Structure formats: C-alpha cells, structure tokens
A protein has these predicted regions:
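Alpha/beta enzyme core
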Residues: 2-233
Length: 235
C-alpha cells in the first residue's frame, strides 16, 4: 500500500475500500502481540472476547466480562502505535439498555484507549449502534455467526444457508450500516452471501470464514500459527 498513515483511523478504512485495498484484522490480547502485529503493518487489532477461549481456556465467549476486555484492551493500546484498536463489547454489556451500552462503551474508550467497539447483532442492536455513533463512539458491526448467541444458534454453525436466512442477514447488514457502523464483520456465511452483502454496502466488510469477496479478512494468531483452528458446523 502507498501513503500509509502514521496512525490508522476510521476514515482511513473507508478510503482503503475505495482504493480496492485489502484490510487486515488480527485478534490481539496483550502488548507483545500488539507490538509484533503493529510492526508488521496489520491494519486493525481486535481485542476480541475470543480471549475467553484462546487465553482463559473457556468453552465460549459468554463468561468474558467487561473488566477482562478492558484489562486486555489497555495492554494492546499501550503497544499499538499505528493499528486501529477495536474492543469487543462482551455478552450482556450492551443488550439491556442503550444507557448501559453507552456507559460500558465509554469505559473501553476512556480507560482502555480503544478507537472503536464491536457489537454483535443486526436490527436488534441498530438503535444502540445509532446512539453510540451519535455520541462520537465508532462502532464495528458483526452479523452471521455471532458467538455470543451460540446457545440460541445451537453451536458454531454456518449461518444464512438458505434464501430466507440470507435475506434476513442482508436486512441486518443494511440496518447496521444505516445506524452508522463504519465496518461490518461477516462470520461463517456462504461465499455468495458475503459477496452479495459486500456489493450492497458502502462500508467495508471483514470476513471470518466468509469467502474471498469481502473488503478484508480477520484471523487470530492461534489460527495463523496452527495452534487452534476455528471450524463451523454445516448442519
């Protein structure tokens, strides 16, 4: 890439999409990871609630607390000088009320130093996304397989596998974009569905198990190194 900024910010991602440049996002959980990835030129560092499984040995992301994400976000932001740092909002830290979401997101920005937060869900969280962005807090969306809903979904299953489900996912994606999200994670959906969503949206799409026709890709260091694989059930 040419003309790399010293510090990536939300508007730079839109510009990268316009130029047809691929966006690279990796999960990072501590200062060492963040420093290595930052020096390698990774665009976005996601302090994911996946730290529950990767770092803490939990079965799901659901037990991860706001304090845990805050702790790791502080470590990552101390070491990342160029990459955009996005912090996951954990399970039930934004679903009860918009005021709750605002308060919890504010901690990730003020105390953690995050440049953005990520919320799972589509139309159900659109009002929350709108309120956060109106308050000046950048939001990344996340649709498809949403790990915080693993019990309702019946496990880590590929989503949007039939036409009706694909249509519902498209509505969710459009709602999140309309609410002001600056980017959208598409996880565990068929390649064709991800391509269709990417072509409809004006914001960047970041794929996790969603094929190649997306604006960027996300992975974790454990997946890249072969220490841990993330697989999805197809039935």
């Amino acid at each position: 890439m040419t003309g790399l900024p010293k510090k990536l910010r939300v508007p730079h991602l839109a510009a990268m999409k316009e130029r047809g440049e691929r966006i690279v996002m990796l999960t990072a959980y501590d200062a060492t990871m963040a420093r290595l990835f930052d020096r390698a030129g990774i665009d976005i560092l996601l302090v994911g609630d996946s730290l529950g499984q990767v770092i803490l040995g939990l079965d799901t992301t659901i037990p991860v607390t706001l304090d845990a994400i805050l702790h790791h976000t502080m470590a990552v932001t101390r070491a990342a000088s160029r990459a955009l740092v996005v912090a996951d909002m954990p399970f039930m830290t934004y679903q009860i009320a918009i005021e709750q979401a605002m308060r919890n997101a504010a901690r990730l920005f003020q105390e953690g130093g995050a440049a953005a937060v990520k919320l799972e869900g589509g139309r159900a969280v659109a009002d929350t996304v709108r309120a956060l962005t109106a308050a000046g807090l950048p939001v990344m969306g996340h649709v498809g397989l949403t790990p915080q809903h693993v019990h309702r979904l019946g496990g880590m299953r590929q989503q949007a596998r039939d036409d009706d489900a694909a249509d519902e996912l498209m509505l969710d994606a459009l709602a999140v974009e309309d609410a002001g999200a600056f980017a959208l994670v598409l996880e565990a959906i068929p390649d064709a569905v991800a391509a269709a969503v990417t072509s409809r949206l004006h914001i960047p799409t970041i794929g996790i198990g969603a094929g190649l026709i997306v604006t960027g890709k996300c992975s974790s260091v454990t997946t890249c190194s072969g220490c841990l694989t993330r697989s999805y059930r197809l039935s």
